[in-house]
């Protein structure tokens, strides 16, 4: 794993040696290359962070509406305009669901004390579980295990679903100024609910991409950033999936490795 061992020592000092040893033995602590840049204009950074949050939450709300649809026709621009236009009598709402809610939970924990954030996230999930809308199987499994007394670092199922990825966005935003910590922090966050190296490495990659995108200078194109992160992913199944997904996008026509 390409992370600094001293970083794990700092996490162990707050989360406990048993937690870090358990997660490391199962190869759940991951890291990838997060490009680092000189500080950019503060207003530009705020605008990018706000845009990222708006995009995530809007996508969650629209996706929730789409999941309730009985058709497979997808959404067009008219659908988006109608759903953004406000709730009318007889028209279904477009509320945020568990992915956005847990995004906020992770962000708040990270902005408090990043080294305690995974444990705080687990505590918050238990405390606020009744407010979660449409949580996935992994979150429900984790919640049951936590309520039965499992430690936060051993409560998650071996899932590699995508429900932890919105929280990875929170890591990338909250720790954008600490690129050397982002991968490990994102993998620890994901491990709270998804005890699979595939899930935690995916979270590390997404958090790194988000951090690089919001901090990049305006003269640095996305095509120079994303492939660098993807190429540093260690698990072939994660790296290959991302390469295949992005290869058809003209923005990422450069080699990934």
Where in this protein do the model-derived segments appear?
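Structured, active/binding-site neighborhoods that engage oxygen-rich ligands
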Residues: 1-257
């Amino acid at each position: 794993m390409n992370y600094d061992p001293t970083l794990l020592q700092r996490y162990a000092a707050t989360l406990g040696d048993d937690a870090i040893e358990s997660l490391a033995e199962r190869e759940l602590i991951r890291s990838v290359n997060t490009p680092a840049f000189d500080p950019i204009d503060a207003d530009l950074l705020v605008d990018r962070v706000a845009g990222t949050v708006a995009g995530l939450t809007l996508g969650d709300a629209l996706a929730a509406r789409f999941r309730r649809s009985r058709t497979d026709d997808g959404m067009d621009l008219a659908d988006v305009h109608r759903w953004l236009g406000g709730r009318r009598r007889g028209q279904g709402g477009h509320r945020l669901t568990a992915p956005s809610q847990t995004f906020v939970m992770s962000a708040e924990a990270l902005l408090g004390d990043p080294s305690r954030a995974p444990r705080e996230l687990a505590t918050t999930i238990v405390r606020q579980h009744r407010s979660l809308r449409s949580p996935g199987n992994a979150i429900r499994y984790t919640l049951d295990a936590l309520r039965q007394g499992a430690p936060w670092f051993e409560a998650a199922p071996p899932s590699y679903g995508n429900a932890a990825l919105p929280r990875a966005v929170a890591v990338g935003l909250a720790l954008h100024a600490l690129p050397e910590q982002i991968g490990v922090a994102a993998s620890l966050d994901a491990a709270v609910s998804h005890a699979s190296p595939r899930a935690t490495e995916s979270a590390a990659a997404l958090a790194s991409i988000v951090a690089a995108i919001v901090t990049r200078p305006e003269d640095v194109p996305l095509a120079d950033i994303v492939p660098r992160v993807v190429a540093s992913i260690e698990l072939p199944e994660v790296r290959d999936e991302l390469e295949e997904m992005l290869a058809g996008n003209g923005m990422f026509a450069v080699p990934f490795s």
